[in-house]
Amino acid sequence: MRLVFTILGCGSSGGVPRVGSGWGACDPTNPKNRRRRCSLLVERSDGRGRTRVLVDTSPDLREQLLDAEVDWLDGVLFTHEHADQTHGIDDLRGLVIHHRRRIDVYLDEPTARALRLRFAYCFTTP
């Protein structure tokens, strides 16, 4: 079995550079300092196939998934309900529509309540 962890974003809730306030203490000449908001891709592969689970759906998710060439997810784990961890959820629709298959979601009850209020359309059966 092989596990691969890909950091899709590691910036703060506003990303780096921040809109309106720039780079802070980060050196703008270093390309690694341009950071998207937090998301992590976990891939497990073995002789039976591959499983991909995304940790959090940052507002930068569309670009993150395109850059990582992700064409399917088996699941999404939400760590908590803050906007910088959840507001990319709509970008999952393209995967669901294309594959005509739901994506399993893992989250605690407070996060589930918040997401059902904000994004009810994501949790209905088409």
Predicted regions located by residue number:
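Binuclear metal-dependent hydrolase catalytic cores
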Residues: 1-126
